[in-house]
Amino acid sequence: MTKSELIAALAARYPQLAARDTDYAVKTMLDAMTQALASGQRIEIRGFGSFSLSQRSPRIGRNPKSGEQVLVPGKQVPHFKAGKELRERVDLVGNDQGDDSSNGSSDPLQSVMDMHAMH
């Protein structure tokens, strides 16, 4: 599901909200999460998962054009760890669909909403 598809699914699910408001809400949430991670904060969404930063160590890489070895510097990268409820929900949905779980027939937004309703 892309960001545009998420916005469209939310707008369809909540017709009382203007599409531009849904678009603004999703973009604002993603911007806030990006800013929090960029400032080194950890984000925890109970029942869904957590976002944090992981440190990648410097390493020796290879320039694909010249074959020359180059030093690739260390860097911070975002990391997502799914929460227990999300893992269980995904496993449950995957088992219900059998081998056809990649056909896109399920409604991912509905799955998230159902998971949230379990609280």
UniProtKB/Swiss-Prot annotation:
InterPro entries from the UniProt entry: Hist_DNA-bd, IHF-like_DNA-bd_dom_sf, IHF_beta
Superkingdom of origin organism: Bacteria
Gene Ontology CC, one term: chromosome
Sorted UniProt keywords: DNA recombination, DNA-binding, Transcription, Transcription regulation, Translation regulation
GO BP: DNA recombination; regulation of DNA-templated transcription; regulation of translation
Presence of the UniProt keyword Nucleotide-binding in the record: no
General function of this protein: This protein is one of the two subunits of integration host factor, a specific DNA-binding protein that functions in genetic recombination as well as in transcriptional and translational control.
HAMAP family (alphabetical): IHF_beta
UniProt-recorded name of the protein: Integration host factor subunit beta
Organism field: Bordetella parapertussis (strain 12822 / ATCC BAA-587 / NCTC 13253)
Lineage summary: Bacteria, Pseudomonadati, Pseudomonadota, Betaproteobacteria, Burkholderiales
